[in-house]
Amino acid sequence: MRRYSLKHVLALFSFIFVVWTIFRYFPEPPAWVTELILKPLVWLAPTFWLVRKVERQPLSSLGFTTKKLFPSLYWGIGLGMIFALEGLLTNIFKYKGLNLIPLDYTPAFFLGTIGLSLATAFTEETVFRGYIFSRLRLLWKNEWLANIVASLLFALIHLPVGVFILGYTPGVMLSYLFLVFVFGLGASFVFSRTGNLASSILLHV
């Protein structure tokens, strides 16, 4: 018997949101500490606990599977390129040219950035697509309603970083949250097409 419950979904999100808001209020530690240690502890640990101990489901119920692996690669990389192109065009129109932040583009920097991006994508996609979206879809039997709600929650979880770390003005904040919401819709869409979390993780990276 499956033990999926809306209460579990809301409790998980509320816990992560409150703890993460408090964390973001304080000075930011190094990115690797946040993405490799703190975020997995706050986001992944309670998610895995819910799945294994409360729902008594395998982790494959989160989308950890080798099924439809190649379609997942196509969806994730293909839609990811579209999002990347959109971001590039936005940058060009905003600054009337290509405005890139000067960084130390060494192999070590590149590999470190990719590694942190993968860690971030793995954690966030496991929680929001693997758990929240998939459970809402199973409970409501409506993919798009589940997608919209999960994407709204995904945007909301990015509010603390926008307020406390990035210091966005209200107008910029709304634009930022809207873009995160749109990305959430795309990530849930590709995950729903494949049932493999690799698709949304690749899109996220």
Model-derived features: where do they sit?
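N-terminal, membrane-interfacial amphipathic/helix-forming hydrophobic leader that caps
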Residues: 1-66, 87, 164
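Aromatic-anchored segments of alpha-helical transmembrane domains
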Residues: 14-25, 81-89, 151-161, 205
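Juxtamembrane helix-loop-helix connectors linking adjacent transmembrane helices
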Residues: 26-35, 58-123, 171-172
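Residue-level signature of transmembrane alpha-helical entry/exit and packing/kink sites
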Residues: 4-13, 32, 36, 40, ...
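Hydrophobic, membrane-facing alpha-helical anchors
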Residues: 1, 69, 101-103, 153-158
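Transmembrane helix-loop-helix hairpins at the membrane interface
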Residues: 109-205
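Membrane-interface helix-boundary motifs at transmembrane edges
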Residues: 3, 32-33, 59-70, 133-142, ...
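Membrane-water interface at transmembrane helix exits
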Residues: 23-27, 51, 55, 59, ...
